[in-house]
Amino acid sequence: IGKDYVDNTSHLAHGVSILTACRENETAMELGGHGLFTELLVSALQGGAADFGGNITIGGIYAYIDRSLGAWSQRPIFKTNVSEFIPIKKVQPKVPLEVIRELTALFATPQQLFDLDPSYEDTNSLQIKHSVIEPYANKENVTKFKLLQKLQSIGFVEPVGEEFMYFAAMNSKQCRLTTLGQHYWRLVHEDRI
């Protein structure tokens, strides 16, 4: 008079990770004669899953594939027994570390709002035919703005009061560090990057 049940647990040795295309009761999808999971896996390994430093880890690969599949019925399975993610591949970082190290030069504190104006936008110049706004492009500000835009591309900086950095500059708004950017600001400040 007891309950029968099957224990479908898996036990992984330390350092082992398993990543599969789908659950046992699902079918792996194909797109144009190729497995969708395999296509996403290859894309992840080519750099799509790289972190800001160009490191590709199994966790990053899973996150990339999971995000890419979205709400589709196929769900990848990821099981791991690791205490840290070791890079399995390194690619060229989207933004060089030298740019990330500029965080503390651009922002005195992690919470600082960076004031922008049209002088930060290099196309706001009398040499380019279109409407220009004072203050005109300033070489020093343009250099800083390009750094800020690179940092925005990896999620470290965001415009305040505008959707795009261009309009934040042209409309004299501000930008700020994101929560992730604040974390890396502290790492740079502590000379850990």
Q: Which stretches of residues belong to each language-model region?
A:
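Cysteine endopeptidase catalytic domains of the caspase/legumain-like
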Residues: 1-193
